[in-house]
Amino acid sequence: MNYFELFKFSPAFDIDTAVLAERYRELQRAVHPDKFAHDTEQQKLLSVQRTAQVNDGYQTLKDPIRRAEHLLSLRGIDLSHETTTVKDTVFLMQQMEWREALEDIRHSTDPQESIDELYQSFAEYRAKLTYMLTAQLNSSKDEDALLAADQVRKLKFMAKLHDELTRIEDALLD
């Protein structure tokens, strides 16, 4: 299913999330199972299925990584069950530095400063990746779609690192 069509957007990485939320509410009202309470079982089932599609579509388009994956899937690149790893050596070296920095937080004299610095580093790198991803997804070239897939892999890794940093910060605050 093309969620961009469902929500009446052109397939693009940059979408107006306020408009997305508004269209989500409109679609929810139109397909909500309560509207079909007195209809046939088949119509009730169809309503439940449409509601699930609308919910999944909203969650997909709302999340930048899932939105990028959806755009790539529309171009024939499926990352949903992928096990391919990033082969970019510069990124792998940066990844190792971040992992070391995460380990060093526990032994830091000012762990909150270290945490803040890592959050800032992650945000800057994610912004750079997102900028490149946007350009690659807006391109119609197949090689740019493959490069975009690599950016998505990196962003997924960055999301995991961010979650790990948040867990470390929460543990230090407890």
From Swiss-Prot:
- What are its GO cellular component terms? iron-sulfur cluster transfer complex
GO MF annotations for this entry?
Answer: ATPase activator activity; protein-folding chaperone binding
NCBIfam families attached to this UniProt entry? hscB, PRK05014.1
- Extract the SMART domains matched here: DnaJ
Species name for this entry?
Answer: Shewanella sp. (strain W3-18-1)
State if Chaperone is listed as a keyword: yes
Q: Where is the J domain?
A: 2-74
Q: What is this protein called?
A: Co-chaperone protein HscB homolog
How is this protein organized at the quaternary level? Interacts with HscA and stimulates its ATPase activity.
Q: Does the keyword Glycoprotein apply?
A: no
Question: At the top level of its lineage, which domain of life is listed?
Answer: Bacteria
GO annotation (BP), single? [2Fe-2S] cluster assembly
InterPro entries in the cross-refs: DnaJ_domain, HscB, HscB_C_sf, HscB_oligo_C, J_dom_sf
Outline what the protein does: Co-chaperone involved in the maturation of iron-sulfur cluster-containing proteins. Seems to help targeting proteins to be folded toward HscA.
UniProt keywords, alphabetically: Chaperone
| Family matches, as Gene3D superfamilies | DnaJ domain, HscB, C-terminal domain
CDD domains membership? DnaJ (cd06257)
Q: Which family does it belong to?
A: Belongs to the HscB family.
